[in-house]
Amino acid sequence: MAAALAFCGCKKEPAATGVGTSAAPSGEAIKVGEFASLTGKEAAFGQSSHKGTLLAVDELNAAGGVLGRKLELITEDNRSVAGESATVVRKLISRDKVVAILGEVASSRSLEAAPICQQNQVPQISPSSTNPKVTETGDYIFRVCFIDPFQGAVLAKFAHRSLKAKKVALLTDVASAYSVGLAKYFRDQFTDDGGQVLLEQKFNGGDKDFKAQLTAIKASGAEAIFAPCYYTEAGLICVQARQLGLSVPIFGGDGWEAPELIQIGGKSMEGTYYSTHYSAEDASPAVQSFVAKFKARFNETPDAMAALGYDSAYVLADAMKRAGNTDGPKVRDALAATKEFAGVTGKTTIDAKRNATKGLVFMTVKDGQFKYVETINP
C-alpha cells in the first residue's frame, strides 16, 4: 500500500528509472520520501510519526516552503513487514526521485533502508530508530533521537536508583535489533553498577503467550523485570505477569511509547515505567504550541513518535536551507553541521557519528494515564 501526499498542487511526474541524487530542478516541488509502518502490527508507531511529519510539512509549505519551493511528501507503507522497507525505499529513490528520506521508527526497518540510501547518496533521517548500527551504515544516514547505549545506561541507573532493584530479569525479543541491543546496553551498565541479571528470557516479536518465560522469572526471585520490546508485546507481558501473581516493577524503553499500550495492558500497566523522548506535559511554549496544533489537526494528543516525526522534517528543511539547494552531498554536509536546532523534543545537535545528543524522559502509568516522571540529560 502506498500513499502519495502532495502539498503543492503540482502534477505528479511519470515514473522514472535509475537512481541518483541530482538536485530537484529549480521551481519544481521538492520531493521528500517517507516510509513508515502505517498498517500491520506496529501501525501505531508509523501513524504517529507520519502525522507529525505531515503537520510539519504542512506548516513549512504554509510559510512559503523551502528555498522558495513547496515540499511534496511521498509516503510509502511498509505494512510492518520485514523486507518491505527496502522495496519501498528503492521505489521512492528510483521512481519518485526523492531528494531525501524520512524514516523509520523501528531500527530493523531503518537498517533495511540505510544501505540503499547510502549507495544512492540520498540523505536518510530516522525520527526514532535508537540502535547505533543505523547511522553506522554510512555518512548519509542520520537520526534526531538519542541512541540505545545512552538509553540502556540511563534505564539501568533508574532501576538501581528509583526502583531499588539489585536483581533483575530481562525479557527480550530476539527478532528485534532494537530489543537485543537495548538489552545488552542495559545489562552492561546494570552489572557494572553492581547489579545482577538473574536470567534473560527470550521471545519472538508477534508472540502472544509469555507465561512460560514469566513463570521462570517469578521463580528466579528477580526484583524487577526489564522488557525492552515494543508496545504490542509489552501490554500482553504486563497482563500475563500480573495474572501469574508477579507484583514486581516492570519497565521498558521507548518501544513502549504508544496510546495502544494502555489499551492492550489495561489495569496491568499501573505502576509501570518506560523511557521516551518527550512528554506532552512539558510546559515549554514550543511543546504546548505543537500539542495544540496537533490536537486541532488530528484530535489526539501527540506522543513521542509524532514529536520526533515533526522534528525530523524541520531538521531536514533547515539543512536544505543552509545547503542552499537539494543536492544530496550538500544536504548531507548541512545535516552533519546541525547544531542546537530547537525542536519540540529538545535541541538537536548532530555529532560526528550522525547521532543526536538529546535528553531522555521517564513516564509512568497512573490511574490509566501516562504521567511524566523526570528528564535525564546526557
Language-model-detected regions and their locations in the chain:
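Extracytoplasmic "Venus flytrap"
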Residues: 24-52, 76-83, 105-106, 171-180, ...
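Extracellular/periplasmic bilobed ligand-binding domains
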Residues: 117, 182-275
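Segments of small-molecule ligand-sensing domains
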Residues: 296-306, 317-370
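Hydrophobic alpha-helical segments within soluble ligand-binding/sensing domains
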Residues: 85, 144-167, 180-182, 208-211, ...
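Extracellular/periplasmic periplasmic-binding protein-like sensory domains
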Residues: 238-310, 324, 364-377
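Beta-alpha junction/loop-to-helix N-cap segments that form part of ligand/metal-binding clefts
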Residues: 15-20, 44-51, 63-135, 203-210, ...
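Short, low-complexity disordered leader/linker segments with a strong preference
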Residues: 1-31, 62, 377-378
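An alpha-beta-alpha
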Residues: 141-205, 224, 316
